[in-house]
């Protein structure tokens, strides 16, 4: 499909061809959900921990004799039913990461790109370059383009001034093409691709 290219100033800068195999797929929310769940599981720290009865700092001696007191039979005060005892089946330090086939991950990325195209939430910019690293100036440019919540994807090398100027603007993310991912595409309103990013995606999925 043919897609209009704009400059950061909002002027026309020609057209670019977008492959239907990447940007023209029918939506599959189940695949997107699987990929996002996989991404978030990888990010989760998993440092949660509660001490079990073997780990709490408390005597392990029998509380009182077995018979003759008329009270219930107990052994260690570390048991979970007692205040200060260990937690039964508590959380342990672990990795929440799980496997997801590479083909499903690749399909998820293409589906996310297609969903943004279908929602008319994609803008292609000829070049993501800022003359100076000034947040105020770049924020004004974004406001003119109507970009209040957006993910910018540049080429393999990001322009230093653009990256610095954009990083203090709320709800704006800037990533090189290597960092493109389903979660960041879905969580932001608009997807802004540079021409270099489009070419890299075409090369990646051809």
Curated annotation (Swiss-Prot):
This is Large ribosomal subunit protein uL4. Residues 63-97 are annotated as: Disordered. Gene3D superfamilies: 3.40.1370.10. One of its GO terms (cellular component) is ribosome. Keywords: Ribonucleoprotein, Ribosomal protein, RNA-binding, rRNA-binding. Residues 64-77 have a biased composition (Basic residues). GO terms for biological process: translation. It comes from Rhizobium leguminosarum bv. trifolii (strain WSM2304). Belongs to the universal ribosomal protein uL4 family.
């Amino acid at each position: 499909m043919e897609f209009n290219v704009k400059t950061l100033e909002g002027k026309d800068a020609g057209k670019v061809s977008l492959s239907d195999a990447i940007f023209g797929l029918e939506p599959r929310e189940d695949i997107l959900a699987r990929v996002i769940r996989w991404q978030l599981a990888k990010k989760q720290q998993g440092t949660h921990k509660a001490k079990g009865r073997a780990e709490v700092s408390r005597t392990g001696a029998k509380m009182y004799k077995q018979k003759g007191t008329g009270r219930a039979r107990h052994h260690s005060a570390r048991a979970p039913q007692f205040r200060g005892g260990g937690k039964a089946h508590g959380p342990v330090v672990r990795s929440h990461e799980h496997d997801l086939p590479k083909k499903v991950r690749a399909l998820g990325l293409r589906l996310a790109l297609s969903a943004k195209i279908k929602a008319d939430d994609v803008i292609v910019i000829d070049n993501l370059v800022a003359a100076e690293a000034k947040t105020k100036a770049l924020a004004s440019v974004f406001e003119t383009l109507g970009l209040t919540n957006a993910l910018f994807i540049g080429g393999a090398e990001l322009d230093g001034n653009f990256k610095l100027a954009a990083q203090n603007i709320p709800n704006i993310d800037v990533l090189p093409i290597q960092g493109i991912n389903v979660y960041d595409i879905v969580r932001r309103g608009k997807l802004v691709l540079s021409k270099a990013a489009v070419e890299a995606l075409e090369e990646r999925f051809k």
